[in-house]
Amino acid sequence: MDMTGERRIVAPRQVVWDALNDTVTLKASIPGCESLEKTGGNQMKATAAVKLGPISARFNGAVTLSDIDAPNSYTITGEGQGGVAGFAKGGAKVFLSDDSGATLLKYEVKAQVGGKLAQLGARLIDATAKQMAEQFFTKFSAEVEKLAGLAEAAPGRAGIVAGGGF
């Protein structure tokens, strides 16, 4: 499955970049995310509960950031095992650019599922992936815009206020 999209976030690029590298912000934004912890370098481990059609699964996996060009772009890749439900793996290239006082975030996603999940069919998988992406970006935008407001209210505290960054 391939998916592309973009989102305009009303916050400076550096604040968006910091949030994309902050485990607290990401955990709050990822649908079903139960835990997200930095394990070293640009590595994280994650647990997420996902419902895809009739199948519910808890995925445990690893996430890696690469091709890092701060504060412009990176690639995030991950792979998770969902027990008898199967597996999911994929990645996203994320690009940031300035957009009239805001930040334009563009993404290109490639993902693959296997096991019982793969038997659900491309239409259901694609629809669920698009819904989860929309939920993520809605929450992420709200979190970042809240952080941007805090940074403006307390100059010198720009960046992630919540902590947990890389």
Question: Can you annotate each of these PLM segments?
Answer:
Residues 1-43, 51, 160-162, 166:
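Hydrophobic ligand-binding cavity/cleft-lining segments
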Residues 116-153:
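A conserved amphipathic terminal alpha-helix motif
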Residues 4, 58-62, 88-92:
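Short, surface-exposed coil-to-beta transition loops
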Residues 38-79:
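Glycine-rich portal/gate segments that line the openings of hydrophobic small-molecule binding cavities
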Residues 16-20, 26, 65, 107, ...:
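Hydrophobic pocket/interface hotspot
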Residues 67, 80-127:
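Beta-strand/loop substructures that line and gate deep hydrophobic ligand-binding cavities in soluble
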Residues 146-166:
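Charge-rich (especially acidic), low-complexity segments
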